[in-house]
């Protein structure tokens, strides 16, 4: 309970830091399906570990304009990009609009082409940032690694600057599954919980879900769509067998 309270407090501090009205923001998230992801979600899971420079909000292309209007009402204006600074930061293809307020606080609004945010998040550079905050609570897809400050880099072509950023925040960023905590070399490939070739589901027992105080909503009642993914389908396990 104490850890959960710390997470709620961290979220409140982030919302206050970016001068947003949480009640209104949560309502917008409810109606549009928008979520907060990136470093902000990790900062809620790891309270007090680092200071945020910006906030990432993800939403489907269909509801993009609604969130733009909300940010405008909160004092944020769209910035005209001078360079393509987002090229290696976000999954492709996505549309990104950077917003700033008068005090220079920065919010990136990312329009997803995917049907569900999980399909975008599982394309992130590493598992430690595969988390999000929805109107119903906080979701961490790989808590067995993330909560132990370890991230598996999904691809060798990941942006090194992004990887170094999380190393600087105290995360062990590894490139092979054998470096992960409690990795079992003799596991059944594609079936074991720790195998990167295993199919995961949003509703499976490995996903960490932290509800908000009211508990009116939860991941099981609010996420009706069956959402699954495979982290590294092309990976060759060291001791593959049919199980």
Predicted regions and their residues:
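Short, flexible/disordered secondary-structure transition segments
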Residues: 8-11, 78-82, 132-135
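Metal-dependent nucleotidyltransferase catalytic core
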Residues: 59-104
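Short amphipathic alpha-helical segments embedded in low-complexity Lys/Glu-rich regions
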Residues: 1, 13-19, 85
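Active-site nucleotide-donor binding segment shared across nucleotidyl transfer reactions
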Residues: 17-70
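Short hydrophobic alpha-helical "box" of cullin-RING ligase substrate receptors
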Residues: 1-5, 121
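Plant-skewed but cross-kingdom recognition/interaction modules and surfaces
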Residues: 28, 33-36, 43-51, 79, ...
């Amino acid at each position: 309970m104490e850890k959960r309270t710390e997470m709620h407090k961290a979220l409140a501090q982030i919302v206050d830091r970016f001068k947003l009205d949480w009640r209104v923001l949560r309502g917008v998230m409810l109606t549009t399906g928008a979520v907060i992801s990136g470093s902000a979600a990790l900062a809620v899971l790891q309270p007090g570990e680092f200071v945020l420079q910006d906030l990432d909000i993800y939403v489907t292309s269909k509801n993009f304009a609604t969130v733009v209007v909300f940010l405008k009402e909160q004092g944020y204006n769209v910035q005209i990009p001078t360079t393509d600074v987002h090229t290696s930061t976000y999954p492709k293809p996505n549309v990104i609009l950077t917003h700033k307020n008068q005090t220079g606080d920065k919010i990136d609004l990312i329009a997803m082409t995917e049907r569900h945010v999980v399909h975008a998040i599982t394309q992130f550079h590493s598992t430690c940032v595969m988390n999000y905050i929805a109107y119903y609570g906080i979701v961490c897809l790989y808590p067995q690694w993330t909560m132990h400050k370890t991230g598996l880099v999904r691809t060798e072509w990941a942006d090194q600057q992004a990887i170094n950023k999380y190393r600087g925040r105290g995360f062990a960023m590894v490139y092979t599954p054998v470096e992960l905590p409690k990795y079992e070399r003799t596991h059944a490939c594609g079936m074991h919980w720790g195998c990167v070739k295993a199919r995961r589901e949003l509703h499976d027992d490995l996903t960490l879900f932290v509800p908000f105080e009211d508990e009116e909503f939860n991941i099981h009642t609010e996420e009706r769509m069956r959402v699954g993914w495979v982290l590294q389908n092309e990976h060759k396990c060291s001791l593959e067998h049919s199980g």
